[in-house]
Amino acid sequence: MPDRAQAALLPDEFPGPVDGRIYVGTCSWAEKSFVKSGFYPPGVRRPEDRLRYYTTQFPTVEIDASYFALLPPAYSRRWAEQTPPGFVMHAKAFGLFTGHAASVQRLPPGFAALLPDRLRESEEVRFSDVPEEFLNACWDHFRAFLDPLALTGKLGYVLFQLPPGVKYSPEALEAMLVWKQELAGRRLAVEFRNRDWAAHPEALDFLAQERLIYVMVDLPDLPRLMPAVEAMTDDWAVVRFHGRNRAGWARAGATTEQRYDYDYTADELRPWAEMAGRMAGSGRFFAMFNNHVRGNMASNARVFQTLVEGREEPGSTP
């Protein structure tokens, strides 16, 4: 439990969604640069206190660590206990499932033994390299991680983020059916990063048919990146804000910090806020900010919240 000084910094208020339908949050609460940005008061240092403080600021958050590693269920169980009723946590799917490379060193104990000899000493493995036994174990572990959040009613969507190089194809659609089968009963959200998907409206028809959530993205307007396409394929709508740093995204080999270093203006966010009001309907709208550098995702999320609440942000263009 926090001491008295810490407790004073950890109010019990839970902000809740705007109008009960529009949730605004960030794509992490523990990313290193975000922790250093000043979002957390000086006395809030322990991981559990940071999460509790976060819940006094926003009603929802994404778990980004589940993309990089298969986390133990003890983590999600603890997070479910540390967050208030009504708080929503979304989990990013393990990167291996979507075709990204996965670190062998970060695999759970015993998992490396399921790999062929030639892969056990590798730094990374990919979906196409691993045997079925290994993949099944990964799915079992990931499902077990999600269960504590689902059982407490705090699990939101499970985000499947496709790599930038993946274009529209029947094989990509078939992979989504596998995800749906492996995580039956969970809400799945799919994010495209390659512009080719925008040229195939049948992809949205497929998502709607399979009750998969289409994730809208706010990215720089560059030839290879997915544009902002307004669409809703489920009663939940999701938009993820990655920033509009053209130089960072256009630069080959740019670091994460270089790409996501962007501070939105109220005018840039206003059209999305208006869209949130239209799309929420009887479902839910999630506005998730991923521009973590210098804490911009939190400050921008707050601006967005004032816009959807109908309160004009000071200093914005009328």
Give, region by region, the residue ranges found by the protein language model.
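Residues lining hydrophobic/aromatic ligand-binding pockets adjacent to catalytic sites
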Residues: 1-318
